[in-house]
Amino acid sequence: MKKLRGIPLPEEKQGLVRYTCLCYRELPKYTQEKIQRLCAEAGGAYSAALWEVMCTRETVTAIALRHHVGESTLYRARKEFYVRWFRKR
């Protein structure tokens, strides 16, 4: 995975979040709930689309078309997801 430029986290932390999400089905329930909560907080009405962005290998374009949402909206939500992952509650 290469570093996503617009996200203010080092490549290692971005990779940690991305690869954790890609293993969603094998994760403990509390981590799955964290991912779902962050999708709801960062994605709002588009939380299902954001979940697909984070937990599948599909392109943002394909997900945006299927969910009738702009790509830029998903990119903003994805950025917020990454930032919130490390925020203390």
Model-identified regions with their sequence ranges:
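Flexible domain-boundary/linker segments
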Residues: 52, 66-67, 80
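Short phosphate-engaging motifs
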Residues: 59, 81
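C-terminal flanking helix
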Residues: 82-89
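Short amphipathic alpha helix immediately N-terminal
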Residues: 41-58
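Residues in the recognition helix of alpha-helical DNA-binding motifs
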Residues: 77
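N-terminal interaction/assembly modules
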Residues: 1-41, 61-62, 67-68, 73, ...
